[in-house]
Curated annotation (Swiss-Prot):
<keyword id="KW-0413">Isomerase</keyword>
<dbReference type="GO" id="GO:0051082">
    <property type="term" value="F:unfolded protein binding"/>
</dbReference>
<dbReference type="InterPro" id="IPR001844">
    <property type="entry name" value="Cpn60/GroEL"/>
</dbReference>
<feature type="binding site">
    <location>
        <position position="495"/>
    </location>
    <ligand>
        <name>ATP</name>
    </ligand>
</feature>
<dbReference type="GO" id="GO:0016853">
    <property type="term" value="F:isomerase activity"/>
</dbReference>
<feature type="binding site">
    <location>
        <position position="413"/>
    </location>
    <ligand>
        <name>ATP</name>
    </ligand>
</feature>
<keyword id="KW-0143">Chaperone</keyword>
<dbReference type="InterPro" id="IPR027410">
    <property type="entry name" value="TCP-1-like_intermed_sf"/>
</dbReference>
<keyword id="KW-0067">ATP-binding</keyword>
<protein>
    <recommendedName>
        <fullName>Chaperonin GroEL 2</fullName>
        <ecNumber>5.6.1.7</ecNumber>
    </recommendedName>
</protein>
<comment type="subunit">
    <text>Forms a cylinder of 14 subunits composed of two heptameric rings stacked back-to-back. Interacts with the co-chaperonin GroES.</text>
</comment>
<comment type="function">
    <text>Together with its co-chaperonin GroES, plays an essential role in assisting protein folding. The GroEL-GroES system forms a nano-cage that allows encapsulation of the non-native substrate proteins and provides a physical environment optimized to promote and accelerate protein folding.</text>
</comment>
<dbReference type="GO" id="GO:0005737">
    <property type="term" value="C:cytoplasm"/>
</dbReference>
<dbReference type="GO" id="GO:0140662">
    <property type="term" value="F:ATP-dependent protein folding chaperone"/>
</dbReference>
<dbReference type="InterPro" id="IPR002423">
    <property type="entry name" value="Cpn60/GroEL/TCP-1"/>
</dbReference>
<comment type="similarity">
    <text>Belongs to the chaperonin (HSP60) family.</text>
</comment>
<dbReference type="GO" id="GO:0042026">
    <property type="term" value="P:protein refolding"/>
</dbReference>
Length: 543
């Protein structure tokens, strides 16, 4: 296919145009008075969202080069979402502001490589400052505040997430389910999550989210590698007769046996899924035993004289619900409380006896998985469209609270970045020279972009608000919900430091890459040929 090659200014301008379109679409959602965006779907009802990364993923432009710009800035949002689970709109607005500011300097003749170096050094300084100004999260009030802000100022959601964290602990798991009622409810159950996903994507029952969900399944636990399909047949037949799904957790499943499971799943003979056992060596056996205790089953191991071909349903574990993604498996089981407590006690004793800090850490992980449990938030809404929107907001809120527990909280509403601008300017003046100093200035000017946009979405003059915030103390910012300046910590308007840090780092990374772009090579669109006459369906036939 023929290629289209664009150089210098034209290349950067085309990228910038794509970024402008994406940033404007995403930025309208920023802040307490941010609006929603409606996504048209080929199938099903339109989706109304307020989530930056979801909007960014939907945007595809006709022009290939502009689309490249969209893809680059989308990466800033996606990476921030992967690292911190929230802050995607902030990352997009920051990256766009840095690129805009940087373009002016490149056009004026500045060396793009030196600018990039300056941007990187400025980002490094700001990351340190964010960590310095972060407050650790000690009580559930702070957790509730973070959840409330992230869920779009929904106090009920913030309180619910704080309650969930109280019950399952900081190491526990909080998952989301679509509820059956109009109200959002919290349900805490025993459960466990481990970092192994399905072996084959064909096991996914929900292809949109790429998840496999098994309700009330049997669980086959074994520490051996399953190579022959004959080993599995007796168990598969028993599970099919019982009419329940089956989850196989084994060291590995070879091609032939795996193909049999996939075929059974696709033909609808048996709802089955397979995951590799978590951990390695002796720790794998211990974790399989943990799962067995939790689910009331047995590990089919030759050490205990048990073989797969003689396994009975009574030896299987059982769970209420199992959710498997490509990376994780979450088991929600009920009952067996006495056994679980005894197992937890045993792990605690092992922790007391061991002297290795690594072993202690791994035992602590196992204890958290066993004792922590899983909190399930059942999302309620009047319509399916509202349900999807609430679910996305809740997902952001849960990720934010976890990020806050990890690295602490900073003043929210774009306040932290705006206040760090003058500190960056004085540091850069002392430590950087020439075009590297200009690179740091690019970052410094971009730092007020999120605050300006929050103010503009609330109907205020962004530039004026940003200047007034910078004149005040570090914790004082602009509360766009009531159009007042206030102490952000006192008002409960806080952001997780991890979210702010990730947004800044990813924005700086993308901006540096775009500014150093000198040439773009893309496929030249082929002219569409007109279809020959009479080639449509139907032709000369009578029906």
């Amino acid at each position: 296919m023929a290629k289209r090659i664009i150089y210098n200014e034209n290349a950067r301008r085309a990228l910038e145009k794509g970024m402008d379109i994406l940033c404007e679409s995403v930025a309208v959602t920023l802040g307490p008075k941010g609006r929603n965006v409606v996504l048209e779907k080929k199938f099903g009802a339109p989706q109304i969202v307020n989530d930056g990364v979801t909007i960014a993923k939907e945007i595809e432009l006709e022009d290939n080069i502009e689309n490249t710009g969209v893809a680059l800035i989308r990466q800033a949002a996606s990476k921030t979402n992967d690292a911190a689970g929230d802050g995607t709109t902030t990352a997009t607005v920051l990256a766009h502001a840095m690129v805009k500011e940087g373009m002016r300097n490149v056009v004026a003749g500045a060396n793009a490589i030196s600018l990039k170096r300056g941007i990187e050094k400025a980002a490094g300084f700001l990351v340190e400052k964010i960590a310095e100004n972060a407050r650790s999260v000690e009580d559930s009030t702070a957790i509730a505040q973070v959840g409330t802000i992230s869920a779009g100022n929904d106090d009920e959601v913030g309180q619910m997430i704080a309650n969930a964290m109280d019950k399952v602990g900081k190491e526990g798991v909080i998952s989301l389910e679509e509820g059956k009622s109009m109200t959002t409810e919290l349900e805490v159950t025993e459960g466990m999550r481990f970092e192994k996903g399905y072996i084959s994507p064909y096991f996914a029952t929900d292809t949109e989210r790429m998840e496999a969900v098994l309700d009330e399944p049997y669980i086959l636990l074994t520490d051996k590698k399953i190579t022959l399909v004959q080993d599995l047949v007796p168990v598969l037949e028993q599970a099919a007769r019982a009419g329940k799904p089956l989850l196989v957790i084994a060291e590995d499943i070879e091609k032939e046996a795996l193909a049999t499971l996939v075929v059974n799943r696709l033909r609808g003979v048996l709802n089955v899924a397979a995951v590799k056992a978590p951990g390695f060596g002796d720790r794998r056996k211990a974790m399989l035993e943990d799962i067995a205790v939790l689910t009331g089953g047995q590990v089919i191991t030759e050490d205990a004289g048990l073989k797969l071909e003689t396994a009975k349903l009574e030896m299987m574990g059982q769970a209420r619900r199992i959710t498997i993604t490509k990376d994780t498996t979450t088991l929600v089981a009920e009952g067996n409380e006495a056994d679980v407590q005894a197992r937890c006690e045993q792990i605690r004793r092992q922790m007391d006896e061991t002297e290795s800090s690594y072993d202690k850490e791994k035992l602590q992980e196992r204890l958290a998985k066993l004792a922590g449990g899983v909190a399930v938030i059942k999302v309620g809404a009047a319509t399916e469209t509202e349900m999807k929107d609430r679910k996305l907001r809740l997902e952001d809120a849960i990720n934010s609270t976890k990020a806050a527990v990890e690295e602490g909280i900073v003043p929210g509403g774009g306040t932290t970045l705006a206040h760090l601008g003058p500190q960056l300017a004085s540091w850069a003046a002392d430590n950087l020279t020439g075009e590297e100093l200009i690179g740091a200035t690019i970052v410094e000017r971009a730092l007020t972009a999120p605050l300006k946009r929050i103010a503009e979405n609330a109907g205020q003059n962004g530039a004026v608000i940003a200047e007034r915030v910078r004149e005040k103390e570090f914790n004082v910012g602009f509360d766009a919900s009531v159009n007042e300046f206030t102490d952000m910590f006192a008002a409960g308007i806080v952001d997780p430091a991890k979210v702010t840090r990730s947004a800044l780092q990813n924005a700086a990374s993308i901006a540096g890459m775009v500014l150093t772009t000198e040439c773009i090579i893309s496929d030249k669109p082929e002219p569409k040929e007109n279809a020959p006459t009479g080639a449509g369906m139907g032709g000369d036939f009578d029906y």
